[in-house]
Amino acid sequence: LTPSFYVGSAGNISAGVIERYIESQRSQWMTMRKAFKYRLYPTKPQARDLERTLFLCRQLYNAALQERRDAYRKAGVSLTYYQQKRSLPEIRTELLEYKGVHSQVLQNVIERVDLAFQGFFRRVKHGENPGYPRFKGQGRYDSFTFPQAGTTGVKLQKDGKRVLLYGIGSVKVKLHRPLEGRLKTATVKREAEHWYIVFVCEVEPKPLPPNEETIGIDLGTNPHFLVTSEGEMVEAPRYFQKAQAKLAPAQRSLSRKKRSSNRRKEARKRVAALHRKIANQRRDFHHKLARRLVKQYGTIVHENLNIEGLARSCAAKGVQDAGWAQFLSILAYKAAEAGRRVIAVDPKYTSQACPTCGHRERRPLWVRVYTCPGCGAHLHRDVAAAQNVLARAWTGPSGVAIPCPRSPGL
C-alpha cells in the first residue's frame, strides 16, 4: 500500500502525514535490536573514573533496595520506580560526587532495582523459588548503562577510534566490526581487568533467500553437542572440562591466598581470565554453529527443554559447559534476523520413541545404538530423537498434522 492509496481513502489528510505514519509503523514492526560489543582501552585515570562510577552506582542500588525494604517493613508501602526516581535530583545536589555520573545512568540503576522486584513478585506468583533481591557486594556490580545513548551521554567520534563517555572523557575503543543501525543504548562493562562497551542498535533484518529445508536438532553434552535429524553429529567442545588442567590449580592457589592481599587479587585475576577465555570460546562456537544452521535450513526445530531444571540435576556440569540456553538464544535471534523460523516442541519421550513405528521403550543413557523391537529398525539414539523432534513440529496436540510452513520473508 502506498501513501496515494491512503490519501484517496482518508479525505483531507496530506500525503506527507500518511507517508510519515507508514514509515513510523514500518520502523516499529520491521526492525530488531542487535548488540555490538567492543573492547575499551582506558588510561589509568579513566579506569579509576570507571571504577568510581561503578562504586557510586552500586552504592545507589543498595540504598534504593534498602529504602524499599524499610518502606515495606515500617509502613507497609511498596515504593515504585517513579517515586524513587524523583529523589535523584536531590541526591545529586546533596552528594556532589553523583554529579559526575549522568542522570540517566542513575535512573537506570533505579530501574534495575525495580526490575529485580518485578522478577521477585513474578516468581512468587508462579510458585517458584522467589529469590528476594539482594544487596550488591564489591565486585558484584559490573556495568552501568546509558539508556538514551543515541542522543545523550555517549558519542562515538567520527574516526571510530574513541568514544566520549559522560564523566569519563574520550576513551580509546577497538571497533573490530562496523556499527550498524540506529544507536539506542550503551552499556559499559567490567570483565575481570578488561573494559567493554556494548552498543544496542535498532537494525533492519537481513532476510536470506527463501529456504524450504527443515531440520530437527537434539542437544547433548557428551560426546555430541548437537545431532540433526539428517544424522549429522557435532562434537561437544567441552571447553570447561578441557580447561580444568589450568583452572583447578589456579582456583586452589586463589583459595590459599590471604583475603584482601595483593597476591589474592592477582590470583583472582588469573582465575577470571581463564573463565573469560572459556566463555569466549563457547560463545564463538555457538555463533558459528547457529549461523551455519540458519544459512542451511529454513525451519529449525528443537526441544523446549527445562534448562534451568537440568542445570540442577546430576548432569549440571555438562549442561552448563555446553551452554544450551546461550546457543538457543543466539539461534533464535540469528533466525529472526535472517527470516528463518525456529520452533520449540515438547521434549517428552523424544529419546524413547522409535521414529519409524512409534514404539516407546526406556533405555539406559549408555545405550547409544539400538534395534527397535517393534519394527526392527537399527537406530542411533540421538538421531532418532532429532527425527522425533522434527516430526513433532508438524503434529498438533491432538495428533493432527500441521502443514509445513514456508520460510517467512521479513
Q: Where are the predicted features?
A:
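Charge-rich, low-complexity N-terminal segments
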Residues: 1-31
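Nucleic-acid substrate recognition interfaces
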Residues: 32-410
